[in-house]
Amino acid sequence: MKRRQKRKHLENEESQETAEKGGGIQRIHRDSPQPQSPLAQVQERGETPPRSQHVSLSFHSSYKTCVSSLCVNKEERGMKIYYMQVQMNKGVAVSWETEETLESLEKQPRMEEVTLSEVVRVGTPPSDVSTRNLLSDSEPSGEEKEHEERTESDSLPGSPTVEDTPRAKTPDWLVTMENGFRCMACCRVFTTMEALQEHVQFGIREGFSCHVFHLTMAQLTGNMESESTQDEQEEENGNEKEEEEKPEAKEEEGQPTEEDLGLRRSWSQCPGCVFHSPKDRNS
């Protein structure tokens, strides 16, 4: 019993000592001054904290990337228009440079091109407006058609109203002309180059467009030109290699081969072919 009481007494004393030590450490930490952050020190002084350089740099770099992405989406390039200079003979378009006017164009076709400067967005179609919408807007509605039919049925063929009505103006492409520029897509002949360019650029207003034809034609001609340049480079490289191989072959021909050396040695070592000196002959 006494031993148990002593053990309990010792354990109680040890627990009290540890509790006192822990309280002293906490008091020391509370009493010691804590280091203040630079922002807190600046706020106590009443000064405005300076902006960090890292934030400004990151914002500047993000602005640059946005601007570059916008610039990449636009590309300035020229569009090529393919045409042929023709002259009219009895309503038939014949070649500009043919001596005989009755000669057909298929025998001596000569296609020319002109660049039309414009800004084209990369990855976008040539025209955002569909052809169907344009045709539906230009075509008259059902009510307008009925009204026109009624007016035609009411008017008699011999009435003065029909005689006084002006005739419709013939389109420019039906007017006979001596010479002009023929579009290679739709084969229509235009009087001036400006009219041809306007037709290619804004032909969608008329219900159809030759814009896509000229774009694809330019791509095909560009591919053919690149292939021809590659073939020429390959031919030049092949000719250079042949020229380098020719002197090497000549050097090999000039040097005696091992077979020739072996034949010479065999003839010199032949017992029947012994050459005597003039002294031996005199003796």
From Swiss-Prot:
It is found in: Nucleus. Residues 228-246 have a biased composition (Acidic residues). Pfam families: Spt46. Residues 142-153 have a biased composition (Basic and acidic residues). One of its GO terms (cellular component) is nucleus. A zinc finger (C2H2-type) spans 181-205. The modification Phosphothreonine is found at residue 170. Keywords: Activator, DNA-binding, Metal-binding, Nucleus, Phosphoprotein, Transcription, Transcription regulation, Zinc, Zinc-finger. The keyword Phosphoprotein applies. Residues 127-138 have a biased composition (Polar residues). Its main location: nucleus. The modification Phosphoserine is found at residue 268. GO terms for biological process: fertilization; positive regulation of DNA-templated transcription; transcription by RNA polymerase II. It comes from the Eukaryota. Residues 1-54, 123-171, 223-283 are annotated as: Disordered. One of its GO terms (molecular function) is zinc ion binding. Belongs to the FAM170 family. The N-terminus is necessary for nuclear localization. The C-terminus is necessary for transcriptional activity. Acts as a nuclear transcription factor that positively regulates the expression of heat shock genes. Binds to heat shock promoter elements (HSE). This is Protein FAM170A. It comes from Macaca fascicularis (Crab-eating macaque).
